């Protein structure tokens, strides 16, 4: 259809609350929990094959996280650990359709759960080392779409573009009091 044949407007609004609790111990060890609602507005697809594809709905999610931030040896060692769970409704998924382009469609429901851990060490005032690891299990709970006239069920499949494992290892060195106009220079 040409753009002149479509005369629609969409209006979206959403309340997105966040609730959190924190406990800071006498040894500067932090423990926390949070619950928050996420939202992404719907919209129009520029390219589409049929009338069902020219609009897509808003997506909603509830995010749950618990974690801790710990420090030891006068802050020379620190560790952060968090567990998370995300319950998604109407997740917006980009589909590439040959000869048409990209079309955004809504998945029925998906969930994402995992763990993130990071460690920092400061052997000297100038030298820092960092290690980060993340594990994510992100899957469709309910998602069906029609491909070439056949209804396909993606329940249990992994979400696209979400790595299961992430890892980084970095180090940095800072030079202090180099001159009067540079307080610190850090190389990573």
Located regions from the model:
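Extracytoplasmic loops and strand-loop junctions of Gram-negative outer membrane beta-barrel proteins
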Residues: 2-5, 46-52, 98-103, 149-157
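Membrane-spanning beta-strands of outer-membrane beta-barrel proteins
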Residues: 12-15, 61-63, 110-112, 164-166
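Extended hydrophobic-aromatic, low-complexity segments
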Residues: 43-44, 77-80, 90-92, 179-184
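Acidic glycine-/aspartate-rich tracts in secreted/extracellular proteins
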Residues: 38-40
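Gram-negative outer-membrane beta-barrel transporters
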Residues: 85-87, 105-188
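Outer-membrane beta-barrel proteins
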Residues: 3-11, 54-58, 104-109, 159
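Signature of Gram-negative outer-membrane beta-barrel scaffolds
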Residues: 1-26
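Membrane-embedded beta-barrel scaffold of Gram-negative outer-membrane proteins
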Residues: 24, 30-36, 57-113, 122, ...
């Amino acid at each position: 259809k040409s753009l002149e044949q479509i005369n629609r407007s969409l209006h979206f609004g959403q309340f997105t609350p966040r609730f959190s609790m924190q406990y800071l111990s006498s040894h500067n060890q932090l423990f926390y929990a949070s619950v928050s609602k996420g939202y992404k507005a719907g919209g129009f697809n520029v390219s589409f094959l049929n009338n069902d594809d020219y609009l897509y709905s808003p997506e909603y999610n509830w995010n749950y996280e618990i974690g801790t931030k710990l420090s030891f040896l006068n802050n020379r060692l620190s560790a952060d650990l968090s567990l998370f769970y995300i319950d998604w409704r109407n997740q917006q998924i980009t589909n590439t359709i040959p000869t048409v382009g990209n079309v955004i469609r809504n998945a029925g429901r998906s969930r994402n759960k995992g763990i993130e851990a990071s460690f920092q060490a400061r052997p000297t005032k100038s030298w820092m080392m960092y290690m980060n690891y993340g594990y994510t299990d992100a899957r469709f709970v309910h998602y069906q779409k029609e491909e070439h006239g056949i209804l396909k069920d993606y329940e249990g499949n992994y979400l696209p573009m979400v790595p299961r494992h992430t890892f980084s290892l970095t180090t940095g060195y800072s030079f202090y009091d180099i001159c009067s106009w540079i307080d610190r220079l850090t190389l990573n």
